[in-house]
Amino acid sequence: MKDIIPLLSQLPQDNFFLERSLHNLGYDIIAGTDEVGRGPLAGPVIAAAVILPADCDHHLFQDSKILSHKKRVHLFQLLTEIDAFIGIGTVSEKIIDEINILQASLLAMKLAIEDLASNCSRPSFLLVDGKFKVPIDLAQVALIKGESKSASIAAASIVAKVTRDRYMQDLHSQYPQYGFNTNSGYPTKKHREAIGEFGITCYHRRSFKGVKEYVDISQEKGGRG
């Protein structure tokens, strides 16, 4: 791990520099992992872990937050076409309420890595987005704003975002009044107003501000919570 520290101090613009450097240090399978869904009032937190082929056009993969929906979907499809290895981890709103959103996010990434390992080889090194390492016995480094520093993390952020958006789109068909198809569970004005009018669903995070205030009210209304 000491050999990695110099790599982090002077990262070039190349967003596959870390992956190549780690491979040169003897880590043959490098995965990036990221999660989506820490801020919403409803729905799960979903993480992805991705191993990119060494010969792919890694510059295409950028932080999902700066890409359009159309571009994210295109890149998600591209990942399947270039035979990238992908793992998905999902932690429900119920578990989020039980263990808090930070621990749920780390758990989702752990599950994504385990899913990745079950579909292909176990990674030898992890590039993790954020400040905290994943609770799993693998060599790893946590990178703040990792999506801008690693193509593998960026690819994972795209997969997680598209996967979660599709989940919330399906949820919208059950509860159209909350606008999950456009807000993905985030606390938009329309979403907050719908909670006030209709109460909460079983998919809302009861420990979150903006939801917990309506738990008893929803029960009194006979709400879906």
From Swiss-Prot:
Location (main, coarse): cytoplasm
Molecular functions (GO terms): manganese ion binding; RNA binding; RNA-DNA hybrid ribonuclease activity
Pfam family of the protein (one): RNase_HII
Co-factor(s): Mn(2+); Mg(2+)
Compartments, as annotated in UniProt: Cytoplasm
Keywords: Cytoplasm, Endonuclease, Hydrolase, Manganese, Metal-binding, Nuclease
UniProt KW Cell cycle keyword: no
Gene Ontology biological process terms in this record: DNA replication, removal of RNA primer; mismatch repair
InterPro entries in alphabetical order: RNase_HII, RNase_HII/HIII, RNase_HII/HIII_dom, RNaseH-like_sf, RNaseH_sf
Domain RNase H type-2: 28-220
One GO cellular component term: cytoplasm
Stretches that traverse the bilayer: none
Catalytic activity: Endonucleolytic cleavage to 5'-phosphomonoester
Co-factor binding details: Manganese or magnesium. Binds 1 divalent metal ion per monomer in the absence of substrate. May bind a second metal ion after substrate binding.
Protein family according to the UniProt entry: Belongs to the RNase HII family.
Function of the molecule: Endonuclease that specifically degrades the RNA of RNA-DNA hybrids.
Cross-referenced HAMAP family: RNase_HII_B
PANTHER family given in the database record: RIBONUCLEASE H2 SUBUNIT A, RIBONUCLEASE HII
Record protein name field: Ribonuclease HII
